[in-house]
Amino acid sequence: MSSLLQAIGAIPNFTDINFLFVKIYLIMRLIKGKKIQLGVVGGGPKSWIGHVHRISSRFDNQYEIVAGVFSRNSKLSKSFGQTLGILKERCYSNFREMAEREAKRKNGINVVAIMTPPSSHQIIAEKFIDKNIHVISDKPFAGNLYS
Protein backbone atom coordinates (compact mmCIF):
# COMPACT_ATOMS: atom_id res chain seq x y z
CA MET A 1 0.00 0.00 0.00
CA SER A 2 2.88 2.40 0.65
CA SER A 3 3.89 2.18 -3.04
CA LEU A 4 0.36 3.12 -3.98
CA LEU A 5 0.45 6.12 -1.63
CA GLN A 6 3.85 7.12 -2.99
CA ALA A 7 2.50 6.93 -6.53
CA ILE A 8 -0.45 9.14 -5.63
CA GLY A 9 1.84 11.60 -3.87
CA ALA A 10 4.34 11.65 -6.73
CA ILE A 11 1.77 12.83 -9.25
CA PRO A 12 0.58 16.42 -8.73
CA ASN A 13 -3.05 16.98 -7.77
CA PHE A 14 -4.80 18.20 -10.90
CA THR A 15 -8.43 19.29 -10.92
CA ASP A 16 -9.04 18.33 -14.53
CA ILE A 17 -10.81 14.98 -14.84
CA ASN A 18 -8.45 13.81 -17.61
CA PHE A 19 -5.52 13.99 -15.23
CA LEU A 20 -7.50 11.93 -12.73
CA PHE A 21 -7.74 9.18 -15.34
CA VAL A 22 -3.98 9.40 -15.89
CA LYS A 23 -3.43 8.92 -12.16
CA ILE A 24 -5.79 5.95 -12.05
CA TYR A 25 -4.15 4.32 -15.08
CA LEU A 26 -0.63 4.71 -13.71
CA ILE A 27 -1.65 3.54 -10.24
CA MET A 28 -3.38 0.46 -11.67
CA ARG A 29 -0.19 -0.36 -13.56
CA LEU A 30 1.76 -0.17 -10.30
CA ILE A 31 -0.76 -2.41 -8.55
CA LYS A 32 -0.19 -5.02 -11.27
CA GLY A 33 3.53 -4.90 -10.40
CA LYS A 34 4.66 -3.44 -13.72
CA LYS A 35 6.99 -0.49 -13.95
CA ILE A 36 5.70 2.56 -15.78
CA GLN A 37 7.43 2.74 -19.17
CA LEU A 38 8.78 6.29 -19.39
CA GLY A 39 9.89 8.17 -22.47
CA VAL A 40 11.87 11.39 -22.31
CA VAL A 41 12.02 14.38 -24.65
CA GLY A 42 14.90 16.73 -23.80
CA GLY A 43 17.16 16.44 -20.79
CA GLY A 44 20.27 15.64 -22.81
CA PRO A 45 23.92 15.45 -21.80
CA LYS A 46 24.29 19.17 -21.05
CA SER A 47 20.97 19.44 -19.22
CA TRP A 48 21.07 19.77 -15.45
CA ILE A 49 17.33 19.20 -15.12
CA GLY A 50 17.51 16.07 -17.28
CA HIS A 51 20.01 14.57 -14.87
CA VAL A 52 17.78 15.46 -11.91
CA HIS A 53 14.72 13.88 -13.55
CA ARG A 54 16.59 10.69 -14.42
CA ILE A 55 17.74 10.31 -10.82
CA SER A 56 14.32 11.09 -9.37
CA SER A 57 12.62 8.59 -11.72
CA ARG A 58 14.61 5.85 -9.93
CA PHE A 59 13.77 6.86 -6.35
CA ASP A 60 10.73 4.67 -5.91
CA ASN A 61 11.64 2.07 -8.56
CA GLN A 62 8.28 2.58 -10.30
CA TYR A 63 9.51 4.07 -13.59
CA GLU A 64 11.79 2.66 -16.25
CA ILE A 65 13.22 5.01 -18.89
CA VAL A 66 12.90 3.03 -22.12
CA ALA A 67 12.87 5.61 -24.93
CA GLY A 68 13.90 9.15 -25.64
CA VAL A 69 15.02 12.11 -27.68
CA PHE A 70 17.87 13.77 -25.82
CA SER A 71 19.19 16.36 -28.28
CA ARG A 72 18.26 18.19 -31.47
CA ASN A 73 21.43 16.63 -32.86
CA SER A 74 20.32 13.17 -34.01
CA LYS A 75 23.68 11.45 -33.52
CA LEU A 76 24.13 12.94 -30.06
CA SER A 77 20.57 12.03 -29.07
CA LYS A 78 21.02 8.41 -30.07
CA SER A 79 24.48 7.96 -28.57
CA PHE A 80 23.49 9.61 -25.29
CA GLY A 81 20.37 7.45 -25.03
CA GLN A 82 22.47 4.35 -25.46
CA THR A 83 24.82 5.45 -22.66
CA LEU A 84 21.71 5.50 -20.45
CA GLY A 85 21.03 1.87 -21.34
CA ILE A 86 18.21 2.54 -23.79
CA LEU A 87 17.99 0.19 -26.76
CA LYS A 88 19.32 1.71 -29.99
CA GLU A 89 15.96 1.36 -31.77
CA ARG A 90 14.27 3.38 -29.01
CA CYS A 91 16.68 6.32 -29.18
CA TYR A 92 15.00 8.75 -31.54
CA SER A 93 16.03 11.73 -33.67
CA ASN A 94 12.95 13.83 -32.88
CA PHE A 95 9.77 13.79 -30.83
CA ARG A 96 7.48 13.22 -33.82
CA GLU A 97 9.32 10.02 -34.75
CA MET A 98 9.24 8.91 -31.13
CA ALA A 99 5.50 9.50 -30.72
CA GLU A 100 4.69 7.66 -33.96
CA ARG A 101 6.87 4.63 -33.28
CA GLU A 102 6.13 4.28 -29.57
CA ALA A 103 2.38 4.46 -30.21
CA LYS A 104 2.69 1.52 -32.61
CA ARG A 105 4.78 -0.65 -30.28
CA LYS A 106 3.07 -3.34 -28.23
CA ASN A 107 5.37 -2.39 -25.34
CA GLY A 108 5.45 1.34 -26.08
CA ILE A 109 5.83 4.03 -23.46
CA ASN A 110 3.00 4.72 -21.02
CA VAL A 111 4.01 8.32 -20.37
CA VAL A 112 6.47 10.89 -21.73
CA ALA A 113 8.32 13.46 -19.62
CA ILE A 114 8.97 16.72 -21.44
CA MET A 115 12.19 18.46 -20.36
CA THR A 116 12.57 21.05 -23.08
CA PRO A 117 12.25 24.85 -22.93
CA PRO A 118 8.67 25.92 -22.05
CA SER A 119 7.94 27.39 -25.48
CA SER A 120 8.12 23.90 -27.04
CA HIS A 121 6.01 22.03 -24.46
CA GLN A 122 2.64 22.51 -26.13
CA ILE A 123 3.56 21.20 -29.58
CA ILE A 124 5.38 18.20 -28.09
CA ALA A 125 2.59 17.40 -25.63
CA GLU A 126 -0.08 17.63 -28.33
CA LYS A 127 1.76 15.09 -30.50
CA PHE A 128 1.93 12.53 -27.68
CA ILE A 129 -1.63 13.20 -26.52
CA ASP A 130 -2.81 12.64 -30.11
CA LYS A 131 -1.17 9.20 -29.87
CA ASN A 132 -2.88 8.45 -26.51
CA ILE A 133 0.39 8.69 -24.59
CA HIS A 134 0.21 10.42 -21.20
CA VAL A 135 2.33 13.54 -20.65
CA ILE A 136 4.31 14.87 -17.68
CA SER A 137 5.47 18.47 -17.95
CA ASP A 138 6.77 20.22 -14.85
CA LYS A 139 7.22 23.66 -16.38
CA PRO A 140 4.67 26.00 -17.98
CA PHE A 141 2.70 24.16 -20.65
CA ALA A 142 2.93 27.03 -23.13
CA GLY A 143 4.90 30.19 -23.72
CA ASN A 144 1.92 32.48 -23.11
CA LEU A 145 -1.61 32.48 -21.67
CA TYR A 146 -3.28 32.52 -25.09
CA SER A 147 -1.76 29.15 -26.02
State where each predicted segment sits.
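Intrinsic structural disorder/low-complexity segments
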Residues: 8-9, 56, 124
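N-terminal amphipathic/basic-hydrophobic helices that include classical n-h-c signal peptides
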Residues: 1-27
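N-terminal Rossmann-like dinucleotide-binding module
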Residues: 24-86
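Beta-loop-alpha module in the N-terminal Rossmann-like domain of NAD(P)-dependent dehydrogenases
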Residues: 90-147
